[in-house]
Amino acid sequence: MSAEEPKSYPVPYRSVLQEKFEPGQTLIVKGSTIDESQRFTINLHSKTADFSGNDVPLHVSVRFDEGKIVLNSFSNGEWGKEERKSNPIKKGDSFDIRIRAHDDRFQIIVDHKEFKDYEHRLPLSSISHLSIDGDLYLNHVHWGGKYYPVPYESGLANGLPVGKSLLVFGTVEKKAKRFHVNLLRKNGDISFHFNPRFDEKHVIRNSLAANEWGNEEREGKNPFEKGVGFDLVIQNEEYAFQVFVNGERYISFAHRADPHDIAGLQISGDIELSGIQIQ
């Protein structure tokens, strides 16, 4: 069982962004390389998804032949000054590259770890197209998210129906002690409490009914790391919640209440949130 069905995207890949790239949003690119890989690039363009002379606010070039990742911009017909850093991606391995936009910079994250900040040289609002080229297999491209307050609380208009999944993208704070994700019932009870505790090195799972906690479940290691990003997926199945962390199945939590009665979401603790989805 997998939290995410693998897809295959054509390379070269071209896409038009339907809305403006705004601060808080993240571009997620996942794929894999081959042993013969030399280079691949991710580009954020203005006006067209090619190099016909229009500006390129961000050029990310992953170079195995040089052992570097190179960041640059193309403006007014000229490339700017390159910013280089050692390439942590290995030939033949899968990779996860995220580009999060902020008011003054792009935050580049490689395999869930902060890689480098790149200050804007062109307006973020000028970005309209995306291109991905080179020696890679591409299996996931997603753009979205925003700045989320923590604590975060929201009703779920359509609930979390059986067969659907909650996706939470975030980064654990470097001095984190705990965070939690709660799925709420209509009456305010907590159908599922998911609580990574770094001070105890466990992840607590529980439920709350009529103001009383049930029996804790805490088997298994804590798969989250301080200062490192994560993808958390909670699948609502008929008999249990299935939990995946960074694409790997983690635990199952048998339902203690009606699985069709999920009406709200709470997220709190020592994390930065970058995305929340239901799919």
Swiss-Prot record:
Keyword Transport listed: no
SUPFAM superfamilies reported for this sequence: Concanavalin A-like lectins/glucanases
Binding site for a beta-D-galactoside: W213, G214, N215, E216, E217, R218, E219
Galectin domain mapped to chain residues: 13-144, 152-279
GO molecular function: carbohydrate binding; galactoside binding
Pfam family, one: Gal-bind_lectin
Alphabetized InterPro entries for the sequence: ConA-like_dom_sf (IPR013320), Galectin-like (IPR044156), Galectin_CRD (IPR001079)
Post-translational changes noted in the entry: The N-terminus is blocked.
Keywords for this protein: Lectin, Repeat
Keyword Repeat: yes
One GO cellular component term: membrane raft
Signal peptide: none
Function: Binds galactose.
Name of protein: 32 kDa beta-galactoside-binding lectin
Annotated organism of origin: Caenorhabditis elegans
Lineage: Eukaryota, Metazoa, Ecdysozoa, Nematoda, Chromadorea
Gene transcribed to yield this protein: lec-1
